[in-house]
Amino acid sequence: MKPDFFALYEALAAGVTGDTPITALTAGARWSMVETADSLGLGMDTPGSTIAPMYPDGLLGLPLREAAKATASWNLEEAAFGLAAANAFYNTPARMEALGTYLSFEKYYTEGIDLRGRTVGIIGHMHGPPGLRDAAKAVYVLERDPQKGDYPDAACDWILPQCDLVLITGSSLINKTLPHLLELCENAITVLTGPSVPMCPALLDCGIDRLAGLVVTDRPGIAEYVRADRRGNPYGYGRSFLLKKD
């Protein structure tokens, strides 16, 4: 992991190029959505507006390369839109094809990783891949808002150094917990996963071994899903990708 806290965010923003402007912003109950004339990106809606935004006039009309810098904002509502802007650039069908990252429905982001005997940490209330709990030695779920059986996220500093595989929700990019989580996971295989995850190769040089996320292919469908605050995950409106270091 690079020692500079914001190195990861700088690497993410540096890869966003061109002058494509943002044409629409939508804040749903669960997802923040950024649209351009040709693309769309998501970021998990994250409460937290006590700090003034980096862009007081908002992100509407800004080019994606500028708006993506807001991922580093400590105004977490703005940061969700910043990551959505980055995803509108990175998570496109054309990029998926160019990088060869399509992950078919019957495969999972842990493909090729032997789960037997592993000590696994899961950041965020996720189920993980099928068979994980049968194969692994131990599975710890760590959650900011813990449910029954989850550890509170304060336990990360104790549990994660014991793990050799850690699955991390993409929303950790937005709430700024990711840099420290990666420090705690320096001896583990790390997978950043979820619809908020950008298909950004530079992040693989920042302590992340795998990036697993969503490329939206049904733009009208996902837009209605976000605006109507529909339940369920958004993967039915696109294709999964897996970008890995190995």
What are these regions (language model features)?
Residues 131, 177-184, 202-203:
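A short acidic, amphipathic alpha-helical/loop segment
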Residues 81, 87-91, 119-159:
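Conserved mixed alpha/beta catalytic, RNA-binding, or beta-rich assembly cores of soluble enzyme
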Residues 102-108, 145-155, 173-175:
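Active-site glycine-rich loop that binds ribose-phosphate moieties when present
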Residues 115, 132-135, 158-161, 182-187:
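Short, conserved loop/helix-junction motifs that constitute active-site signature segments
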Residues 121, 165-169, 191:
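Structural motif
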Residues 190-246:
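C-terminal functional extensions of proteins
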Residues 138-140, 178-195:
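A short, gly/pro- and small-residue-rich
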Residues 1-127, 226-228, 242-246:
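Electropositive, gly/pro-rich neighborhoods at or near active sites that engage anionic ligands
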